[in-house]
Swiss-Prot record:
Protein's name according to its UniProt entry: Small ribosomal subunit protein bS6
Gene Ontology CC: one annotated term: ribosome
PANTHER family the UniProt entry points to: MITOCHONDRIAL 28S RIBOSOMAL PROTEIN S6 (PTHR21011), SMALL RIBOSOMAL SUBUNIT PROTEIN BS6M (PTHR21011:SF1)
Similarity section: Belongs to the bacterial ribosomal protein bS6 family.
Matches recorded under InterPro entries: Ribosomal_bS6 (IPR000529), Ribosomal_bS6_sf (IPR035980), Ribosomal_S6_plastid/chlpt (IPR020814), Transl_elong_EF1B/ribsomal_bS6 (IPR014717)
Gene Ontology terms for molecular function: small ribosomal subunit rRNA binding; structural constituent of ribosome
Pfam families: Ribosomal_S6
Chain's role: Binds together with bS18 to 16S ribosomal RNA.
Record HAMAP family: Ribosomal_bS6
Gene of this entry: rpsF
Domain of life, source organism: Bacteria
Length: 95
């Protein structure tokens, strides 16, 4: 198993309950595929450096994950399908 950092941005128009449900949903996808979420950090609403899809800000969420690559691929696939996720990026944690 490898360590990963997954950062994703949720649309600013999503209310607090829906945001929590979305975070929980993606955490469950990782655990259902044999991974573990070590830490979930809600970084709050932040302004973008440039406009993305006519939006100027979004809710940033950072996940520290230990998982197999298949769990990461499935999570990324679901994030790309979701209209509530503006952007996502996964990096291998080398620490």
């Amino acid at each position: 198993m490898r360590k990963y950092e997954l950062l994703y941005i949720i649309r600013p128009s999503v209310d607090e309950e829906a945001k929590k449900a979305l975070i929980e949903r993606f955490n469950n996808v990782i655990t259902e595929n044999g991974g573990t979420v070590e830490k979930t950090t809600d970084m709050g609403k932040r302004r973008f450096a440039y406009e993305i899809n006519k939006m100027r800000e979004g809710h940033y969420v950072l996940l520290n994950i230990v998982a197999e690559p298949k769990a990461i691929l499935e999570t990324e696939r679901l994030m790309k399908i979701s209209d509530d996720v503006v952007r996502q990026m996964t990096t291998k944690d080398e620490r």
